[in-house]
From Swiss-Prot:
Keywords: Metal-binding, Zinc, Zinc-finger. One of its GO terms (cellular component) is protein-containing complex. It comes from the Eukaryota. This is Protein mlo2.
Length: 329
């Protein structure tokens, strides 16, 4: 029989699943099974959930894990890294819906700070960011952590072209530079210290040029610790490479290949079961084990003989299961 686009041998299926996992790991390289709420206030990757914002009427942001495990089908805005923030998932800010990862509703982080980024708006132009249509480079202010278009920075820089991105490491937006300029740089930098309403472009070693007077040091330690030392950024642990990607390249035994296929396919089922209520989960585990056993028996001859598994074969398998199930009722 000729193989069609919908017909695969078990070995081909294994190879396809391995490639899909590799691609998925490139897009989502980190594990997403732990909410950061219990870790307190962190500088971490955040995602504003516009869906929950509409439901609760409150600005919010959730951690990397919750963006996938709890809000995957919601309208999310990637905020990148934000400092001193506690995950809002499972709080009143996300409509008091329990977090799937910690199974509870908790108080929202009272120290969280929100700006227009949490509405999906960025820069002094206050426009909605659309990654599909956005052109040009955006830079993040080291102080307020808002993001700015290169063209908008040039306008606030009195029309003077901003430096090449490779020549500076950090940005201080025009609003923050005006607010803190007396405490940012040593007064010997007269051309910079005297500039009003203009962005500052800081080199990697800018901390060596900060004003050394006691009042400025005290202010920086209290209000601008990010200028004193680089902040640690929390990153979720990398996703373990278990499952299909660890399969032997060419299993010698058909039984081994079948076990690999079944185990890999069922891993996602187990993750879902872990989030179900206990009684429902127990019933589902029984059904899961029965399906795994039946599917193993069904696929073994195909793997042993390297036969093609067709769409019709799979349909017949589930039709037979359905027929037996009805007879047992």
């Amino acid at each position: 029989m000729e193989e069609t686009a919908h017909e695969l041998t078990v070995k081909q299926y294994v190879e396809q699943q391995r490639e899909l996992e590799r691609e998925a790991r490139e897009v989502l390289p980190y594990s997403f099974d732990t909410c950061t709420y219990s870790m307190g206030y962190l500088k971490q990757p955040l995602y504003a959930c516009l869906t929950c914002q509409k439901a609760s009427g409150s600005l919010n942001a959730v951690c990397y894990s919750c963006s996938i495990s709890c809000h995957a089908d919601h309208d999310l805005v990637d905020l990148f890294n934000k400092r001193h923030f506690r995950c809002d998932c499972g709080t009143t800010r996300t409509h008091s819906i329990p977090c799937n990862l910690r199974k509870s509703v908790d108080e929202c982080g009272s120290e969280n700070d929100y700006n227009h980024n949490f509405e999906g708006r960025f820069c002094i132009c206050d426009t909605v960011y659309n990654p599909e249509t956005e052109e040009g480079t955006m830079f993040q202010c080291i102080l307020c952590e808002d993001w700015f278009h290169e063209k908008c920075l040039q306008k606030t820089n009195k029309g003077i072209a901003i430096p090449d991105a490779e020549t500076f490491e950090w940005l201080v937006c025009s609003e923050c530079s005006e607010k803190y300029r007396d405490h940012l740089l040593n007064q010997k930098h007269e051309s910079i210290a005297g500039t009003e309403r203009a962005p500052l472009f800081l080199s990697e070693n800018f901390r060596e040029n900060l004003c050394p007077c006691e009042s400025c040091i005290s202010l920086r330690n209290l209000e601008m610790p990010m200028l004193v030392a680089e902040e640690p950024i929390y990153e979720p642990p990398e996703d373990s490479e278990d499952g299909i990607s660890e399969m032997n390249e060419d299993p010698s035994e058909s039984g081994e290949m079948i076990e690999q296929v079944i185990s890999s396919t069922m891993n996602d089922v187990l993750r879902i079961l872990d989030r179900l209520p206990r009684v429902q989960a127990n019933e589902s585990v029984y059904a899961y084990n029965r399906l795994k056993s039946e599917l193993t028996d069904f696929l073994t001859p195909f793997a042993r003989e390297n036969r093609v598994v067709t769409k019709e074969d799979i349909s017949n398998f589930f039709l037979e299961r359905s027929r037996i199930s009805k007879n047992l009722r």
